[in-house]
Amino acid sequence: RTTPVAPKDLALAVQLSYLSGGGVGQAPLRGTALLRPADASFPGYDEYSFEPPRDPKVRNADEEGDNSDREGKLVADKLALNTDREGAASFTIKDLPKLMRANDVLAEISFNDPNGEVQTVSTTVRVWPSAVVLGLKAAGWASSRGKAKFTVLALDTSGKPIKGQAVEVRGRLAQTISTRKRMVGGFYAYDNRTEVKDLGVLCSG
C-alpha cells in the first residue's frame, strides 16, 4: 500500500465479516482515530538520528512540546458508520495537522457482535511529513577541540537510500552559562541561561 506523505486527509477502509464467511451487511460501526508522534528508525542505520531539529530554547527533550502531544491527539471521535451489503465501510480523517516528524495514526473500529458484546479492532498507519527522511550520525557527541564530524544520509520512507538527493546542513551552537549567586545565610544558587549562535550552512551537496 502507498505510504501517506504529508496527508491533509486520510481514508481508511473497513471490512466486517462473519467467521463462517461472508460480510456483515448494514452493521453500525463507530470509528475513532488518534495521531501520535513516532520514533523513526530503520534497520542497518541504528547509529543515525532521524529526529527533527530541537527548539534551541528547550534544554532537554522532556521539556520540548506538550506532554499531551506525545500521548496523542484525537483526530476522529466515534464517527458513525455503516457497512454495505458486502460488509465493507470506509471513513476519512479530515484536516490532519501539518507534520514535523513521523506520526502514527491509531484507528479503532467498535461494533456489536451477534451476542450484543462490544468488540474493537484497530490498525496503525505510519504517516510522514516528507518522502525524504534525513539521518544524521555524529562521530562523537562530545568534542574537546571545537570540531565535530558528522555524516548525513537521505532515505525514503521504507529505509532505502536515495541517490542524488540534494541536502543542506545548518548548525547551531548552544552554550549554557551558569552564574553562581550568594544567597542569604551563606548559601549559593545557580542561574542558568542558554545562548544560541546560528552557524549557518555547514555543508551541502
Mark where each language-model region is.
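A structural signal for beta-strand and strand-to-loop patches characteristic of beta-rich domains
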Residues: 1-205
